[in-house]
Swiss-Prot record:
Catalytic activity, as annotated: L-seryl-[protein] + ATP = O-phospho-L-seryl-[protein] + ADP + H(+); L-threonyl-[protein] + ATP = O-phospho-L-threonyl-[protein] + ADP + H(+)
PTM statement from Swiss-Prot or TrEMBL: Dually phosphorylated on Thr-174 and Tyr-176, which activates the enzyme.
Enzyme kind, highest EC tier: transferase
Source species: Candida glabrata (strain ATCC 2001 / BCRC 20586 / JCM 3761 / NBRC 0622 / NRRL Y-65 / CBS 138) (Yeast)
Gene behind the chain: HOG1
Sites bearing Phosphothreonine, chain numbering: T174
Keyword Cytoplasm in annotation: yes
Protein kinase domain segment(s): 23-302
Annotated keywords: Activator, ATP-binding, Cytoplasm, Kinase, Nucleotide-binding, Nucleus, Phosphoprotein, Serine/threonine-protein kinase, Transcription, Transcription regulation, Transferase
Chain positions with Phosphotyrosine modification: Y176
Name of the protein: Mitogen-activated protein kinase HOG1
Amino acid sequence: MATNEEFIRTQIFGTVFEITNRYSDLNPVGMGAFGLVCSATDTLTNQQVAIKKIMKPFATAVLAKRTYRELKLLKHLRHENLICLQDIFLSPLEDIYFVTELQGTDLHRLLQTRPLEKQFVQYFHYQILRGLKYVHSAGVVHRDLKPSNILINENCDLKICDFGLARIQDPQMTGYVSTRYYRAPEIMLTWQKYDVEVDIWSAGCIFAEMIEGKPLFPGKDHVHQFSIITDLLGSPPSDVIDTICSENTLKFVTSLPHRDPIPFSERFKTVEPDAVDLLEKMLVFDPKKRITAADALAHPYLAPYHDPTDEPVAEAKFDWHFNDADLPVDTWRVMMYSEILDFHKIGGTDGQIDTSATFDDQVAAATVAAAQAQAHALAQAQMSQNMIDPNQLLNEDGTPVSGSIAENSSNSATTNLNGAAAGMNSASDTINEYANQAVHFANEFQQ
């Protein structure tokens, strides 16, 4: 079993970072979705990596599910223009760390330093759309595409990151998701019935920002955001208005004076015509009339880079069966640990479930594993209090506790009463042993 000596603790922005001794030279690089991100050196590969700490992933069932979703997505989505998961581990404090390649900068920082030359705008836009084609083919909507989620290295290789908000393609999706400047109008107008087209709108806003060096729709609030969109696109067409579900929103939109659109050729007079044409096809009020990522790649503007044989789609749709699940934290914990062990190609560990099984079967197995771990913890607590013979330990049904559990409990009670007493405080301490095993076996596997 892994021990704390395998981890190095340091304070980053007042937050404890606990990493295995495989990684060194930690430096903060920013905050990602729901976590702190640091750069580090991977001593096994001698390469620079980014380590994202997911803080308190098991604090609530909502946080556990969100972390599980991001882990599943990172395992499933493997593409040159998407951030790639290289390692994952759990710390003794039960925080989760995702390790990915380090890109150096992001598009937001790049745009703040200098205007982009035309060839870079073209190449970056191609890579964004190439990544989106793959993501959408997997049945996934990113939902939070913005310049700070577009990572770039010194070779101009671009990768989309932060899938913490990603969701299934679902015509009934609801919520308040992307950063305002890049938010599609259907989200503001309806708050539901949106799909992959929201990413195309966001990519169009990013495209315009790369061209002009400043945000296209810098709204101060929802009303102002909608107003400056209509300044360019004109009033939304009637078929879009008909999809508005909120009565208050409908009253607001229909109360506005009619606005005519400004031709994109006038708004972007100094921009090459092919770029203007593609931008106009991406920034359309009606999401169903917006160009797709696949069709955008074939647009004449991207002809210098377009290669239909090198713009792959996902081999399989992402499995979203867990999306509507309402499970307790301990069940999510077991499922998460099992996914981590599977990532490291480790099998046969106590408490591990089969991640290739159907979701319902995984839930059933994880529920049993969580219950067994709780029983183990209660047995430890019972012995620490009563110092009874481990051979006398009984399950609730009257059957003897298995020998290995009893023996481990006895050893724990006789050699370290304080450690055994900790099991009484929380059954999750025992479940955390699965995490330590995951780290231990992963380290052995990588050496």
